[in-house]
From Swiss-Prot:
One of its GO terms (molecular function) is acetylglutamate kinase activity. NCBIfam families: argB. The lineage of its organism: Bacteria, Bacillati, Bacillota, Bacilli, Bacillales. Its EC number is 2.7.2.8. The keyword Cell cycle does not apply. GO terms for cellular component: cytoplasm. This is Acetylglutamate kinase. It is found in: Cytoplasm. Coiled coil: none annotated. Pathway: Amino-acid biosynthesis; L-arginine biosynthesis; N(2)-acetyl-L-ornithine from L-glutamate: step 2/4. Its main location: cytoplasm. The gene is argB. SUPFAM superfamilies: Carbamate kinase-like. Catalyzes the ATP-dependent phosphorylation of N-acetyl-L-glutamate. It comes from Listeria innocua serovar 6a (strain ATCC BAA-680 / CLIP 11262). Keywords: Amino-acid biosynthesis, Arginine biosynthesis, ATP-binding, Cytoplasm, Kinase, Nucleotide-binding, Transferase.
């Protein structure tokens, strides 16, 4: 969708939205850009799980999600994180609406074939009609990373993956993956640009690890599937690291 910008907010990033962030959103809207946000909430999910004495586990950067963890994830994402984001927009008189998998089955997903991960899903389809309808009315959409399978079971979906799938489905002109670091680091230095075919090498040499592994895998998917530009950064003003299709690392 021409002139569409997708922004993924990490759990911590969503709690620290600055005036500069909102000024950039307002500027883009004045330029007739359409804005979609996909939010995470891992920090708050972990905090709630610990408070409820539910074990917190991850595997290859993904949260292990049993039935209890899934219910906590839904509660935190839809009941805490998303309302905080939409309220921040409303305070600035910016039209916004929160969406989740329960809205027209927005994100269809299949359960990942890994019994250790539990109720973790991979998106198979993004139903863009509702999103496009809202964008046509200049309403910003804020999407929780939860999917629903063919049996109408809810699944936890990695927020980076969800954002990249949404951006690809909309053929977005840009995708910003906002996180708590200013870009992908090689030691103390930020890598300006990464080619999708160089990501495996960065992983095997331990330049990327932990949660950055699925983040870069998702970014590579977006870069190779219709998204104009993909940027990993900590703010909309920071150039961060650009992920490009098969371009040498600089």
């Amino acid at each position: 969708m021409k002139n569409t910008i997708v922004i993924k907010l990490g759990g911590v990033a969503s709690d620290n939205l600055t005036d500069d962030f909102f000024q950039q959103i307002i500027k883009w809207q004045a330029e007739k850009k359409k804005i979609v946000l996909v939010h995470g909430g891992g920090h708050y999910i972990t905090k709630m799980m610990k408070a409820l004495d539910i074990p917190v586990e991850t595997k290859k950067g993904l949260r292990v999600t049993n039935k209890q963890a899934l219910e906590v994830t839904k509660m935190v994402l839809i009941g805490q994180v998303q309302p905080a984001i939409t309220t921040a927009f409303q305070k600035r008189n910016i039209s916004v609406i929160g969406l989740n998998a329960g809205d027209t089955g927005l994100l269809e997903a299949d359960q990942i074939n890994d019994s250790d991960l539990g109720f973790v899903g991979k998106i198979t389809k993004v139903k863009t009609a509702l999103i496009e309808q809202l964008l046509a009315e200049n309403i910003i959409t804020v999407i929780a990373p939860l999917g629903i399978n063919s049996a109408h079971d809810w699944l936890n979906v990695n927020a980076d993956t969800a954002a990249c799938e949404v951006a690809s489905a909309l053929n977005a002109e840009a995708l910003y993956l906002l996180t708590d670091v200013p870009g992908v680091k090689n030691g103390a230095k930020i890598i300006d640009e990464i080619a999708t075919d160089e990501i495996n090498k960065l992983q095997t040499t331990d330049i990327i690890k932990g949660g950055m592994i699925p983040k870069l895998a998702s970014a590579a998917f977006a870069a190779e599937n219709g998204v104009g530009q993909v940027i990993i950064t900590n703010s909309l003003e920071n150039p961060g690291t650009k992920i490009k299709s098969k371009v040498a690392i600089r």
